[in-house]
Amino acid sequence: MAAINAFYAQSGGATAVINATACGLIQEARRHHLADPTRIGQVYAGRDGILGALREDLIDTSLESDADIARLRQTPGGAFGSSRFHLGPLATHRAMYERLAAVLAAHDIGYFFINGGEGSMGAAWHLSQMMREIGQPLRVI
């Protein structure tokens, strides 16, 4: 059984707190991968947040050392870039959600983590609805 990969996006104002969250997420994914390689595979970060997924501009965090990932806890700004790009509602922006679904499928991504505010949570909800509608499994957090 192949591992399911994860996608992480930073959204909104980039702060050291967002980087600390990215650090924890990547470290925990690595821990789970070591315990059971079929559970979770690579963690991809979107360059400039959700725009990275739309452009298929993904950063493979498995190429970074454990020490570099640990340094994220103390790194100011958004390490992977961020944006305030708003996806909008599914009803009027279906093509963008379909593009996201295609990119996620191409990279075997089954976990989608978005770190941001209210707009990010709206996008996460719309994405989860789209994925459910098309029958593509995705855990959106």
For the regions a protein language model found, what residue spans apply to each?
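N-terminal phosphate-binding or glycine-rich loops at protein starts, especially the Walker A/P-loop
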Residues: M1-D57
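A short, small-residue-rich loop immediately preceding and capping a beta-strand
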Residues: N5-S11, G110-G119
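Short, ordered loop/turn segments at secondary-structure junctions
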Residues: S11-G13, G46-L51, R84-F85, G117-G119, ...
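Alpha-helical scaffold segments in soluble metabolic enzymes
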Residues: A20, G24-E28, Q42, R71, ...
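Glycine-rich oxoanion-binding loops at beta->alpha junctions
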Residues: R55-F112, G119-M121
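Short, acidic/small-residue loops that bind anionic groups at enzyme active sites
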Residues: S128-I141
